[in-house]
């Protein structure tokens, strides 16, 4: 059995082995280390204080279960000084004794055991070793205070042999594991002393350099700026290293992102300037985060990234047909627009604007176009935006400034050629902070948006490849310059048959899925869907229809959840069952009841939520020929009433009106739903008809509605919104519609199935209106005319 330097016997092979992840135990030194690996803990449970074990360094500190090839060849026999339990494992104190050469690992469970032999050192020239040790001792006394180590204490107190003294000095230097292993593996004493002397000289030089750097930094910066000092130290170190390599820090990562962003020349120059500013300020500076956020926005924008665009028009048409019922003219115009984009390869075409009431599919059309063409789709909601900075961004001088919604949309899209939908453009407001609608003029102008400048970025960004789409409910709310930049595609609404088809193919499956109802558990008949459309909704779109179907599904889901046997019952909803699920009928066709007396006529109006019918009521009473007009009417509508009355008075004889009574009676014209503002010229024909009916005691036909502007000479002028108005008449159960002759061309836009159920009567003058709208025989005792109420809460109407 071999003897160790301490006089103890070397352990027999195989002996317990403790691998160290980092660091080296030198002979003659004491090491305290935490122990937590299961096999290392098992070793500590098997030994006691005073036992001798082997300690060896790992080549790879990340290796959890090292094998022979993962361990160095030279280790140290160590005496266990103390073992104590701590919160996260054990703490071991060991003392290095002698080197050993590792031969093999013979056991790995439950702990490591190894075979090895004592590795004796070779003294060589004893006098040379003594002189080298003395020199090393003096040098250690000098270097110790500079390096902040206990080298001076070791030099003063150690009486070890030259080889062990070299080990003690090497252990105190705090060297990397690789350099410590170079010393441990050197079995010749003289070369070991020489190697340690060189390492001590390097440590001294590094200490001098650090002192110089600290001095340079302190001369430039005041006391207490800890973070700035650390940063300046790093810069000074990099300066002394003259180009040394370093890992990628935050600044380097930001520089790399800017390099990869493909910035144009002007943006690149600004980014480089801001990068230099960022380098010159410390993280504690208020400007640091401002500059960094600005550079991150520049790096995140798609300056050159483009989506691969699919230009298959058949695919676009198929997608539109799949997701939208009807709207044939709308789809055709969309395809024409996409064809121009395909042929020119540019998005610098007129901006499409989908105009129509809520729920007709304006927003979803944009999504369908994006899906079919492969472009990312981004929606910007503009409803209620009153600040121009919401679109253009805030200038960086403001605290918390950020880019506007246009730049946000491009960042979200990650490409410079997305489809951007500007939703509810007509809901834009204006305030003392500027007009956001005016800011849209540059965005939507193909000649100007190539150099769009956001206030925050203050850099030109090319928007010419972006396909902008807009949606509005009321075109009249747009300014003339903005309206001029848009190509309007009107979506007037759906017919009852189209609504039923949409409900069957889209709304019902969607609600069944959302309510976790098996399609086989619920069946809604076509008659029930038709009744929902007729009796529970009165809209141009299908949004309310979707809510009613959702309500029905909730009621059915309750029945299924309450099923006693746990099996889902099959529910078939008939039209007669709707009262149980949806409550009382909400809408009735009361046109006949309202027009059953003279003096009441049915008109047609356009509102931002679609077409609607309105009633013009007139009454007369003893008086002095005065006229009262009520119903919250606008100036244009009041003038239409006066013009209609003037025509009646001037043609009283041919209309069968007693002129004497006109001077002795007051007239009252009222449009119900007085809480709703109304305006527009198209109620002129309806007011004339109501007045003529009142004064001639002839009822207006209950199945007839009308629209048109009248002149003092009795001409009927064209008006707008014909398709929406006719669809509203059809929804209300009207069978005959009187329209201006010059609106005959607009009848082509009305769906064929609606035209087949309506009689459209085109007129040029008032005499034709009277012939088409009034009954032949007068009624007895015309009285004071019919006055009935109207449903409140309807949207503002343009008559």
UniProtKB/Swiss-Prot annotation:
GO molecular function: ATP binding; ATP hydrolysis activity; ATP-dependent peptidase activity; sequence-specific DNA binding; serine-type endopeptidase activity
Coiled coil: none
Residues spanning the membrane: none
Keyword Cytoplasm included in the entry's annotation: yes
Location in or out of the cell: Cytoplasm
Residue ranges of domain Lon proteolytic in the record: 595-776
Induction annotation: By heat shock.
Annotated ATP binding sites: 356-363
EC number(s) stated in the UniProt entry for this protein: 3.4.21.53
Gene3D superfamilies linked: 1.10.8.60, 1.20.5.5270, 1.20.58.1480, 3.30.230.10, LON domain-like, P-loop containing nucleotide triphosphate hydrolases
Catalysed reactions, semicolon-separated: Hydrolysis of proteins in presence of ATP
Annotated PROSITE patterns: LON_N, LON_PROTEOLYTIC, LON_SER
Key words of the record: ATP-binding, Cytoplasm, Hydrolase, Nucleotide-binding, Protease, Serine protease, Stress response
Catalytic residues of the enzyme: 682, 725
InterPro entries named among the record's database cross-references: AAA+_ATPase, ATPase_AAA_core, Lon_bac, Lon_bac/euk-typ, Lon_lid, Lon_proteolytic, Lon_Prtase, Lon_prtase_N
Pfam families in alphabetical order: AAA, Lon_C, Lon_lid, LON_substr_bdg
Gene Ontology biological process terms from the UniProt entry: cellular response to heat; protein quality control for misfolded or incompletely synthesized proteins
Domain Lon N-terminal per the UniProt entry, residue ranges: 15-204
Top enzyme category: hydrolase
Record has Nucleotide-binding as a keyword: yes
GO cellular component terms listed in the entry, alphabetical order: cytoplasm
Entry function: ATP-dependent serine protease that mediates the selective degradation of mutant and abnormal proteins as well as certain short-lived regulatory proteins. Required for cellular homeostasis and for survival from DNA damage and developmental changes induced by stress. Degrades polypeptides processively to yield small peptide fragments that are 5 to 10 amino acids long. Binds to DNA in a double-stranded, site-specific manner.
Protein family according to the UniProt entry: Belongs to the peptidase S16 family.
Record note on quaternary structure: Homohexamer. Organized in a ring with a central cavity.
Protein's recorded name: Lon protease 4
Organism this protein belongs to: Sorangium cellulosum (strain So ce56)
């Amino acid at each position: 059995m071999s003897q160790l330097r301490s006089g103890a016997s070397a352990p027999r092979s195989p002996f317990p082995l403790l691998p160290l992840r980092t660091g080296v135990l030198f002979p003659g030194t004491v090491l305290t280390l935490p122990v937590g690996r299961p096999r290392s803990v098992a070793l500590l449970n098997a030994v006691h204080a005073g036992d001798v074990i082997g300690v060896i360094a790992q080549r790879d500190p990340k290796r959890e279960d090292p094998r022979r090839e993962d361990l160095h060849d030279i280790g140290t026999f160590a005496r266990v000084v103390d073992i104590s339990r701590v919160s996260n494992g054990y703490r071991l104190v060991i003392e290095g004794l002698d080197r050993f050469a590792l031969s093999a690992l013979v056991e790995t469970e439950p702990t490591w055991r190894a075979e090895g032999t004592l590795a004796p050192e070779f003294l060589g020239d004893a006098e040379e070793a003594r002189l080298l040790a003395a020199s090393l001792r003096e040098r250690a006394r000098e270097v110790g205070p500079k390096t902040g180590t206990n080298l001076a204490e070791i030099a003063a107190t150690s009486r070890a042999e030259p080889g062990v003294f070299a080990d003690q000095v090497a252990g105190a230097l705090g060297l990397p594991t690789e350099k410590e292993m170079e010393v441990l593996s050197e079995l010749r004493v003289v070369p070991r002393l020489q190697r340690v002397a060189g390492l001590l000289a390097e440590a001294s030089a590094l200490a001098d350099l650090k002192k110089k750097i600290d001095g340079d930094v302190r001369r430039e910066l005041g006391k207490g700026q800890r973070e700035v000092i650390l940063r300046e130290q790093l810069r000074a170190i990099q300066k002394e290293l003259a180009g040394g390599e370093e890992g990628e820090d935050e600044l380097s990562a930001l520089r790399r992102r800017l390099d990869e962003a493909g910035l144009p020349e002007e943006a690149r120059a600004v980014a480089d300037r801001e990068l230099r500013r960022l380098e010159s300020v410390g993280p504690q500076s208020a400007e640091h985060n401002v500059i960094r956020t600005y550079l991150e926005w520049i790096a995140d924008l798609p300056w050159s990234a483009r989506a691969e665009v699919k230009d298959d028009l058949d695919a676009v048409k198929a997608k539109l047909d799949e997701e939208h019922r009807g709207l044939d003219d709308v789809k055709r115009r969309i395809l024409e627009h996409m064809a121009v984009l395909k042929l020119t390869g540019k998005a610098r075409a007129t901006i499409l604007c989908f105009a129509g009431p809520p729920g007709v599919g304006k927003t979803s059309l944009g999504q369908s176009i994006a899906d079919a063409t492969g472009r990312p789709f981004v929606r910007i909601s503009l409803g209620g935006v009153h600040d121009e900075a919401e679109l253009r961004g805030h200038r960086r001088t403001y605290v918390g400034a950020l880019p506007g919604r246009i730049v946000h949309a491009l960042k979200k899209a990650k490409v410079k050629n997305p489809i951007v939908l500007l939703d509810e453009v007509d809901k834009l407001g204006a305030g003392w902070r500027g007009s956001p609608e005016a800011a849209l003029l540059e965005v939507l102008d193909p000649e100007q948006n190539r150099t769009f400048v956001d206030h925050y970025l203050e850099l030109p960004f090319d928007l010419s490849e972006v396909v902008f789409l807009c949606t509005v409910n009321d075109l009249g709310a747009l300014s003339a310059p903005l309206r001029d930049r848009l190509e309007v595609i009107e979506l007037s609404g759906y017919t009852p048959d189209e609504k039923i088809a949409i409900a069957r193919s889209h709304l019902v499956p969607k609600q069944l899925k959302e309510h976790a109802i098996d399609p086989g558990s619920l069946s809604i008949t076509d008659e029930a869907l038709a009744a929902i459309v007729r009796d529970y909704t009165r809209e141009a779109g299908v949004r309310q229809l979707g809510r009613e179907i959702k309500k029905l599904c909730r009621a059915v889901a309750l029945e299924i959840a309450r099923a006693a046997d746990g099996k889902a019952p099959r529910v078939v909803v008939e039209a007669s069952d709707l009262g149980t699920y949806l409550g009382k009928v909400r809408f009735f066709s009361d046109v006949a009841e309202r027009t059953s007396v003279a003096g009441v006529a049915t008109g047609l109006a356009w509102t931002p939520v679609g077409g609607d019918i309105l009633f013009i009521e007139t009454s007369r009473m003893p008086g002095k020929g005065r006229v009262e007009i009520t119903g919250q009417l606008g100036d244009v509508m009041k003038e239409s009433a006066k013009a209609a009355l003037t025509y009646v008075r001037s043609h009283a004889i041919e209309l069968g009106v007693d002129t004497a009574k006109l001077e002795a009676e007051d007239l009252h014209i009222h449009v119900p739903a007085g809480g709703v503002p109304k305006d527009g010229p198209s109620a002129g024909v309806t007011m004339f008809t109501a007045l003529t009916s009142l004064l001639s005691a002839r009822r207006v036909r209950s199945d007839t509605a009308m629209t048109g502007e009248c002149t003092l000479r009795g001409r009927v002028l064209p008006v707008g919104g014909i398709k929406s108005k006719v669809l509203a008449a059809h929804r209300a159960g009207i069978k005959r519609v009187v329209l201006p002759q010059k609106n005959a061309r607009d009848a082509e836009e009305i769906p064929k199935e609606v035209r087949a159920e309506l009689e459209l009567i085109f007129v040029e003058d008032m005499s034709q209106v009277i012939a088409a709208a009034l009954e032949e025989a007068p009624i007895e005792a015309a009285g004071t005319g019919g006055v009935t109420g109207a449903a409140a809460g309807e949207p503002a109407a343009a008559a």
